[in-house]
C-alpha cells in the first residue's frame, strides 16, 4: 500500500495519470474521477489540449485543498475518439468508483447513456452529446450542462440574423451545413430544419466522411450552390481542411460559422491569415489568457512542475474547455457534499443529485477563477442544461477574439423540440417520466 501511494505521488509530480485499485481508492479516501481522452489518432491535436486542461483543473482543485478537504484522484484511458474503445474505458474505470463520466464523444455518449441508469454513473456532456437529454424528466443520468448542439446551432443563426439585420432577413437565403458524418455531426440537423421552416431559408446538407481530409467534392457543391452562409460542424483535421478548401474555392471565411469544436487554435493555426474572418460559436468561454483561472493554473500547477501539457497552451480555447468541463463536474461533487456531507466521498447517485441542483452564481464562478469567462448556470430536475447562452468569436489571423455580445438561444423553439424528442425516446425505451417525488431523490 505504501508503494502504491508512493507511485501515486510520483506520478502526480511527473504530471502522469493516476491509477488506484478499488481497495486503494477506498483506503485513500479520495474521490475518483475517470478521464476518457484521446491523445492518439486523427483527433489528437484537438483531444490532447482538452485533456490537458481537464487534468490540470483536477490538479488545481487538489492544490487549492480539495473539495472541502477531499482530494481527487484520476486515471486517463485512451479512446482514440472511438466509440467501442470509449465504452471499454468506461467499463474499466467505473469499477474504481467513478464519480461521473465525460465521454468527449457524441457517439460514446449515445452508447453510455444506455448503461448509466443501471450503473448509476452520471454522464456529463459539456456543450455536446444528445441535445434532448436536457430534459431531466426523461434523462435522469445525463447532464448536457452549459448548452447543447441545438443551443449552438440557434446561436449561430441568431448571429447570422444580426449580420443580416434581423432573423426575418434570412427568408430566401441559402445556408449549407457541412457536417461530420457521425452522430456528432447530425445533432444540429433537427434544429436547423425546424428553423428553416420557420424562417424560410434553404438548408443544404453536405456530409463529410470521417476524418474529413477529402472535401473537394463537397466544396465543388458549395461553389455550384453559392450558399449565403456555411455552417461547419466538424472536428479535428476536417476543420482546417474545410477552411483550406474555402480559401481555394474563394468562399469568404467571414460567411463561415463553425460549431465550437471547429473554433479552436488547432483548426486555424496552419491556415493563419487564410482563416482570417472565420467565425465559430463559443459556448460560454473562448481563449482566456488573462483570466484568474489561467493565472492560478500557471502559478499553482505549472509553476510547481505539475503541468500536464505545454505551458503555452494554458488559456487557449480547448484547454479552457477541458478546464471548464472538469470544473462543472467538480462542482457537482461539491453540491452533493452540501447535502450529503462535506469532505466525504460521494457516490454516483449523490453526485447525480448535485449535478441536478447546481447553482453556480456569478459570485461563485468568479471565486473559482471564471470571472468574465462564464455566465451563471442553474440546473433542476427538468433542466439538466442550466444555461442557453453563447457568443461568437472570430479568428483575426493570430488569435480568437469575441465579436458578438452574449446570445441566448430561443428556448421557445428549443424546448418543444427537446420535449418531443425526449418523449419519443421515452416511448421507444418504455420509460416513465420522473414524478415530483423522484425529483427530490
Segments (PLM) and residue ranges:
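Extracellular/periplasmic Venus flytrap/periplasmic-binding protein
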Residues: 84-85, 132, 140-250, 288-295
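Extracellular/periplasmic periplasmic-binding protein-like sensory domains
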Residues: 246-326
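Signal peptide-proximal N-terminal region
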Residues: 52-74, 165-168, 197-200
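Periplasmic-binding protein-like
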Residues: 93-106, 122-126, 174-179, 226-236, ...
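Sec/Tat signal peptide C-region and signal peptidase I cleavage site
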Residues: 19-26
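Extracytoplasmic "Venus flytrap"
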Residues: 30-55, 77-84, 105, 178-187, ...
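Segments of small-molecule ligand-sensing domains
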Residues: 306-319, 330-405, 409
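Beta-alpha junction/loop-to-helix N-cap segments that form part of ligand/metal-binding clefts
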Residues: 30-32, 45-52, 64-136, 145, ...
